[in-house]
Amino acid sequence: MDLRQLIRDIPDYPKEGILFFDITPLLGDPDGFRRAIDLLAERFADSGATKIVAAEARGFIFGAALAYKMGLGFVPVRKPGKLPYKTVSVSYDLEYGSDTLCMHEDALLRDEKVLVIDDLLATGGTLSGVIDLVEHFGADIVGIGVVIELEFLNGKEQLRSYGCESILQIA
């Protein structure tokens, strides 16, 4: 099954000059969605992970489904003000500015084995922020998995030491 056929290209969204890769056709196709989760599960079957950490919003979709498939806990990473309990936060740089991500202060244990999942790897900014949060807890990142990697943006370079895996590469 060619998962690329289930990703819709939308030019000039959310602003002019940006090519947006829409995953909703993949999510709407039961076989395609199942295949994406199965491929991620195969890649990380021997990772030793105990938790999956994923950032909102689209990372939740794949992270939660993969956690269910692998029998692991799921930890959401959200923007400030979106989690009800006490949080730990980290600010990180984006291509044009910065942003902040938060996790509950009791979400991870020291030395816990964590798999970080997201829908798309572009420049690596968001994933770097998630990594900083996970490492704040003293947890160990045993892998990073993404559905789509935009190879032309070289985001994988800054994640090299964590073993980033993608199931679909767009050059």
From Swiss-Prot:
Catalytic activity: AMP + diphosphate = 5-phospho-alpha-D-ribose 1-diphosphate + adenine
GO cellular component: cytoplasm
Pathway this chain belongs to: Purine metabolism; AMP biosynthesis via salvage pathway; AMP from adenine: step 1/1
Enzyme Commission number(s) of this protein: 2.4.2.7
Matching InterPro entries: Ade_phspho_trans (IPR005764), PRibTrfase_dom (IPR000836), PRTase-like (IPR029057), UPRTase/APRTase (IPR050054)
One GO BP annotation of this record: adenine salvage
S-S bridge residues: none
Enzyme class of the recorded protein, top EC level: transferase
Localization annotation: Cytoplasm
Keywords tagged on the record: Cytoplasm, Glycosyltransferase, Purine salvage, Transferase
Superkingdom of the source species: Bacteria
PROSITE patterns reported for this sequence: PUR_PYR_PR_TRANSFER (PS00103)
Gene Ontology MF, one: adenine binding
Pfam assignment, any one: Pribosyltran
NCBIfam families: apt (TIGR01090), PRK02304.1-3 (NF002634), PRK02304.1-5 (NF002636)
Subunit structure: Homodimer.
Family, per entry: Belongs to the purine/pyrimidine phosphoribosyltransferase family.
Stated role: Catalyzes a salvage reaction resulting in the formation of AMP, that is energically less costly than de novo synthesis.
Name this protein carries in UniProt: Adenine phosphoribosyltransferase
Organism annotation: Solidesulfovibrio magneticus (strain ATCC 700980 / DSM 13731 / RS-1) (Desulfovibrio magneticus)
Name of the gene this protein is made from: apt
